[in-house]
Amino acid sequence: MAVSEQSQDVFPWLKSLPVAPEFRPTLAEFQDPIAYILKIEEEASRYGICKILPPLPPPSKKTSISNLNRSLAARAAARVRDGGFGACDYDGGPTFATRQQQIGFCPRKQRPVQRPVWQSGEEYSFGEFEFKAKNFEKNYLKKCGKKSQLSALEIETLYWRATVDKPFSVEYANDMPGSAFIPLSLAAARRRESGGEGGTVGETAWNMRAMSRAEGSLLKFMKEEIPGVTSPMVYVAMMFSWFAWHVEDHDLHSLNYLHMGAGKTWYGVPKDAALAFEEVVRVHGYGEELNPLVTFSTLGEKTTVMSPEVFVKAGIPCCRLVQNPGEFVVTFPGAYHSGFSHGFNFGEASNIATPEWLRMAKDAAIRRAAINYPPMVSHLQLLYDFVLALGSRVPTSINPKPRSSRLKDKARSEGERLTKKLFVQNIIHNNELLSSLGKGSPVALLPQSSSDISVCSDLRIGSHLITNQENPIQLKCEDLSSDSVVVDLSNGLKDTVSVKEKFTSLCERSRNHLASTEKDTQETLSDAERRKNDAAVALSDQRLFSCVTCGVLSFDCVAIVQPKEAAARYLMSADCSFFNDWTAASGSANLGQAARSLHPQSKEKHDVNYFYNVPVQTMDHSVKTGDQKTSTTSPTIAHKDNDVLGMLASAYGDSSDSEEEDQKGLVTPSSKGETKTYDQEGSDGHEEARDGRTSDFNCQRLTSEQNGLSKGGKSSLLEIALPFIPRSDDDSCRLHVFCLEHAAEVEQQLRPFGGINLMLLCHPEYPRIEAEAKIVAEELVINHEWNDTEFRNVTREDEETIQAALDNVEAKGGNSDWTVKLGVNLSYSAILSRSPLYSKQMPYNSIIYKAFGRSSPVASSPSKPKVSGKRSSRQRKYVVGKWCGKVWMSHQVHPFLLEQDLEGEESERSCHLRVAMDEDATGKRSFPNNVSRDSTTMFGRKYCRKRKIRAKAVPRKKLTSFKREDGVSDDTSEDHSYKQQWRASGNEEESYFETGNTASGDSSNQMSDPHKGIIRHKGYKEFESDDEVSDRSLGEEYTVRACAASESSMENGSQHSMYDHDDDDDDIDRQPRGIPRSQQTRVFRNPVSYESEDNGVYQQSGRISISNRQANRMVGEYDSAENSLEERGFCSTGKRQTRSTAKRIAKTKTVQSSRDTKGRFLQEFASGKKNEELDSYMEGPSTRLRVRHQKPSRGSLETKPKKIGKKRSGNASFSRVATEKDVEEKEEEEEEEENEEEECAAYQCNMEGCTMSFSSEKQLMLHKRNICPIKGCGKNFFSHKYLVQHQRVHSDDRPLKCPWKGCKMTFKWAWSRTEHIRVHTGARPYVCAEPDCGQTFRFVSDFSRHKRKTGHSVKKTNKR
């Protein structure tokens, strides 16, 4: 334990670390602890921690020690009675055990920030430990050459220096159930004697024995006694005894009181920075060797010690405070905190829960379930008990309790108002989902006495506890079938607690075990109802169910779901990777909004006694409504191996259900209540109900426009006698429990493939809860149209089904379970995340990704968008937030703390939905007629990342076909200057289709290649970049099609479009904007108009009649079309300079007249006052109504790819008004861009195979010398080919694609693609040749790291 004798100056970062706030309540405010904490929570939570200085003195030292010894003695006696062991010293005083904690740095450890903790094996009385602690402190300071009295900052400096010095150990007695405060009965008596205020802190409501269940704390309604949560724990420490970075269980508040001794330093990080904090720990603490989920679990072991300096440098808000004896420290939900003691001291702590905790309770429960930790509490149970208790209160006019202060009542009313609002919102959400899922059928109520149904067993709890074999601190499970789970005290968790004690809210409990403080939670209604329900106790005594998707304990309503036979067969045999994409794209939040959009008037009732079928959409149908026709084909089942690697591949599936498919499936019934069945199994389409009547139901009814669940249509059972027929494959028909929200999501996913069997269950007191919610809603003036829900009692068959579902929870299914196939099994994903396969990246699960702040791999871009031009040197700085008393700017904080652009996220999701291909059951994608597969997958994804796209666009309709009058001569194709004139041709049939890379036709001699952004026309010599992927390389199935509906649809210049409104919207947004301005700026000379029909089909007539809104939208979309080539990564060509010269000549002739007339023309065009002849209209990608008043002469127009230039700020403006000023500004920007293009094209590389050009001769010379001319790079290459490939480093070009079916990953380099393919194939080619090792590795980096760390031989490397 060598200690450096150098000067112990305070670290600068410690001096600058913000100090957490301290609050000094008045005596009146101090009477209601929860109300006061709720009052300061908004301010203090931005620090994560705060300090409260009581207005009353602490208890005397003698009293505190006496109470502590009494608690320790009682605990020892209880252990002796339970057959354990108790320890007392020879004088008869109680003793306690301690743990050894490492101080110092051990570089040999894999992760040095994880400090070892182990049992010391010593037993001390309070006096003995105090003597040893003070002796250690004296000796340590003497070796440091420091005086005995040090400031807090000096001690902190000593501590952090010791953490990086030679290791030594200290002792700490923590997590000991007990309290040093006087018993509650004695405290109440003394309070009465003193007039209700108390003489010391222990005689007030701040007595730690009662804080968890204080008035206003939600934990008041927990029936279990969990040490450290609902009852306090004691901590006895010595100098440098530390507690590691952690958050409280379920993100609860914690209250900590220091009784006596030296001070204690606390460090805190606010909840807003929690995810960023975890990422810094993962990167800087764990060396990026753990994925985020395992990082969170490892932090939960409470062994990670890291200096706040690391977090401050990484942009994480962090603060500190020093707790002195007699002071309280409050930590707020989700705030990470750690600290250490300055010397010998002892204190105690427990959890509380203010109403603000309810806002984050669900997310905390999901994160806890994601690491397979069993839940300790149901936030919904506490919420319901809390609100119903408020309803049964005695009116204040006859309340014998004195009103202490208006502040107390005001703070309490704020908390009550918040809980009531959350309560009503939750019941409304349930009401909508019950109505949409149940279709009006009675919902089963769980029995009041459910001893015959074992809802939770010890096996289930034990299987959820995690054991970490690497650490001496671990959770031990003696026997999965035993009655208790033994928890090693060294793990920093709670004491040895029986499962039935700790999780009694999950299991059946005695109905007579009620605390007197909770008696008012039982009734809120009349005395008659109270007598009627005298057998039932508070709502907390009812059993709880855990959702398989999110892990949250559903206290009120659950759904038991089983896929139907058809859906199960599909799930077991087909590649279902697109389900994950569907979930990632839609999100669960949309379902609630969708449910609220439903109309309850169309609901029909089902059979009341059995599971009922959900109306499904079969795949064999062809429905025609009016002039609208939609059709789909029956899927072909494709077989695929169901293994872990297949699941990994499914995480990268690139197809999802698009809006187009949803709209096609939306069918209007011919008459109210009358629908037609299209049976997938080949039946006559009718199902017979129990009463013998024939009931038709609509198989086509899909979602509403918001993807909601339809309430219309009838459904009845075919298999009434046995609704769940046993199948040979248990995994395919396994019953699972879902919360209502995720049950609705699963129903929506499986609806097209056969549907589900569904049983809805509610708490036996749910009708009473819903009745109370309606009263509270009126009180809060919340208007809602409640759906009427009928309830029924469960039958014996229902109880057997419930028991089977709960048994399936305990039986851990493999990767063939249908919920695993569907990607909605949270427990399986949590287990999978701990496998070596996912050591650095979590397996995709939408719930887990959202809980840990990760974006969906479907929507996330593989590389960051490049900001080029002059804007790259200037980073816009803005205020991100205020934490720890400081305003944080965007350049100061960790990237995880930067606010996400909600509009950008929505547009990205919309873009993903529109770009994603439709996929049938065979795994093949069906492409729109005018979009090639390659262009959509590559360009669409890139375009989504760089531009915000409107969710809706102007429908594009097929116009009259045109015939080329004057072709392009050979001369014009050389200088790329041409003139085209078109005339209407209604008598000539023309072909618009061609297989391959080019598309041409008699009427369309120019076509935009969506993949490359190059104009293809007759006589035009095509060229392409070396970095681009050819369509032919991906197979002959990829075709480029023009967007004509049919050849015969052109006749007579008028037609009915074969596209409905929504199809055209999709086609527009899927079009790559690849047409240069020279072809888009045409004068329309042949008058055409669109007339909207009620059925959504547009008809053409002979006069322009277009609304201002449509015109403005078209002009805005033209802005997007102009800049597409800028964003495609397509920069230089071999003939850049020639085209630039021609463009400059043309510009001098036309720019002035265009400026004078463009604004006036657009205004007249938008108002419908002016008709112009059509010069051309091409149905290729990105064609828009762009008007030029004066047509330039022959030779003035040209096609020229745009340069990757600066991004104009108006790129995302699709709906702004096109005024004269806007048009003039656009012309000025065009001139600036052309100047840059000319500069860029001034110096062309003439080396063979190189098409790059530069703006200066210096850059060109460096380039020819095989030196990268990019500023700050300057790399040298021995081959010009490698230099050209190196340019990918400085651009967004990712030409290489993963060949695995369903994977959307793209790469810049071949080696990275090769390594990625191993993820799909499971290949592990690197094998350690060391005897008795034989480890295999997928990546060479992992293999090299293994050899460095182990020293194994590198000479015998094998590849297999």
From Swiss-Prot:
It comes from the Eukaryota. Its main location: nucleus. It is found in: Nucleus. Changing residue 1340 to A: Reduced binding affinity to DNA. Induction: Induced by abscisic acid (ABA) during seed germination. Induced by dehydroabietinal-dependent (DA), a diterpenoid tricyclic diterpene that promotes flowering and systemic acquired resistance (SAR). Up-regulated by heat stress (at 30 degrees Celsius) and remains up-regulated transgenerationally in the unstressed progeny (at 22 degrees Celsius), partly via a heritable feedback loop involving HSFA2. Residues 1225-1238 have a biased composition (Acidic residues). Keywords: Abscisic acid signaling pathway, Acetylation, Activator, Chromatin regulator, Dioxygenase, DNA-binding, Ethylene signaling pathway, Germination, Iron, Metal-binding, Nucleus, Oxidoreductase, Plant defense, Repeat, Stress response, Transcription, Transcription regulation, Zinc, Zinc-finger. This is Lysine-specific demethylase REF6.
